[in-house]
Amino acid sequence: AAGVLHHPVYPDIDGVDDFAGAVFHSARWDHSAPLEGKRIGIIGTGSTAVQITDDLIGKVSHLSLFQRTAQWIFPQENPAFSEQEKQVFRDQPQAMDDLHASLTRLFADTFGRAVIGDKEQMQRVEDTCRANLEDSVRDPELRAKLTPDYQAACKRLIISPGFYEAIQQPNAELVTDPIERVEAGGVRTKDGRLHELDVLVLATGFDGHSFMRPMDLIGRDGVDLKDVWAETTQAHRSISLPGFPNYFMLVGPNSPIGNFSLIDISERQLGYIMQLIELWRGGTVNEISARQDAADRFNASVKDAMGDTVWVTGCQSWYLDKHGNPAMWPFTFDKFCDDMSAPDLDEYELVS
């Protein structure tokens, strides 16, 4: 259960170590760095950068957001539950379960289908994002800078209730000129301007393809996972690896992390894995690992289905591996649920 987004990626920018103020990756936040009333620079415009901007804009004297790529922003509707509604959930737990099920189905049938090729649903997603931008940002010059040149959801779709409002505050600046280098006093862009800063935040994302690495994992006959995954990361049903008995992953390669709720995904994968573990616990088998032919068939089906997905429409993102292959789930939510309902033991090598 090593997760996906936990290996920070640092930008290849000259002079970062020369910066005189506090500089840190957003995932390695320096809580000792004072922020109130300071000049803050944020490099990056992904989900983390958007959240930081929204949170800090009312606390700092100036915020410079350095943007390389504009992002689509989906409006967030997240109303608080009233005390009366919460009491209903306490009195009738099934009501909460029913709400969860209805929201899961709604998301699966809309966004979940949009990303795998449902053109009607994708048009709705993109129309909503575009309307959010046009309704929220009146200045045409700023709106043009914030308009992406790729299809919505090709990169990870950002959901935010307040980013557009934050970036339009008097103490906010969207910087789209490329960064030349970092200096002691701030960030110099290629137009020659020095953006003077007290704190520099590197919201530059994560390596989404390392998974449990650099942890050493040695399989049967001394096979090293680093060698198996040297070119691309693959697994059988995102969970098991041929030649690595009794090793199972949550949210492994090609899990639907860009499609559905990560919590729901993990719970269903865990239920599947526990059925395999029960075979071992009950003494039926000593070793369980995916068959190579089963894994090959699964990964071939994934590759064949990727052509219809939004992730191959031309943008660059961590959804793609170094060869440009999407590491996502190209099927429906229902197929994922069916696949995770029970393991097909014919797909596994079982050693007593």
Question: Each PLM stretch: what is its role?
Answer:
Residues 29-32, 170-190:
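A conserved short coil-to-beta-strand element within the FAD-binding core of flavoproteins
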Residues 5-138, 172-173, 195, 224, ...:
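Rossmann-like dinucleotide-binding core of oxidoreductases
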Residues 121, 264, 271-352:
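C-terminal active-site-capping segments
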Residues 10-25, 188-239:
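Central helical "cap/lid" subdomain
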Residues 1-5, 40-43, 63, 179, ...:
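Short hydrophobic core segments
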Residues 116-125, 150-162:
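Short beta-strand to alpha-helix junction loop
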Residues 13-17, 32, 158-164, 217-248, ...:
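FAD-binding beta-loop-beta segment adjacent to the flavin cofactor pocket
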